[in-house]
Amino acid sequence: MKIGWKKSRKGFDMSETDDHEHTHQHDPGHKHPLQPDQDDTITYFKAMEAAVRDLLIEKDLITAEQIRVKIEQMDARVPANGAKIIAKSWMDDEFKNKLIEDPRKAIREFGYDIGPLRLIVLENTERVHNVVVCTLCSCYPRWILGLPPDWYKSREYRSRVVREPREVLKEFGTHISLDTEVRVHDSTADMRYLVLPMRPKGSESMTEEELAALIGRDAMIGVTEVSIL
């Protein structure tokens, strides 16, 4: 299987082409040695991960099935999970208060496990707009939002949003009134942030499911606001 890259106006698209014909047979227990792909050389850390994983399995400290299940759980983490939590807080003031006071407990009761790290929920209001960044790397509440977007990890965003947040927000189409304070929060290795956006006007008659459908990932990072299209 070869990964082919092609340039487009939106960046690089990855397509797969299978030009490796398997004309030879494999024994059931046969293992291929790790080989570098054309576009993805095996780095030191990838080799170390593979070696440690194989050693743990060999020593019966963990099974391949347990690793697979954990990867599936990680892959299931998507922004829609966070959107459901936000929508619930808009519909239920008691849950909202719990979410702000003790996010881990509230989210666990809602049905998601956010792990051992500290999570702080930042509520946007008419007077304060919160936006999240990780200036050092890409720390991000992956348990409820999935993987961070590429722009969140970029050096440009990480360096500019702390210096000129309003300008950066404008580039996302978000114009914050000068009467509203913009606060930038820097995530760390042991602490993450989740923005609780303001509920959009005109959504009073909407159901919790309908509200959740309005909430995008970027609003929970703080670079956009939630609106009714």
Predicted segments with their positions:
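Terminal, compositionally biased segments used for targeting/anchoring and flexible tails
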Residues: 5, 15-229
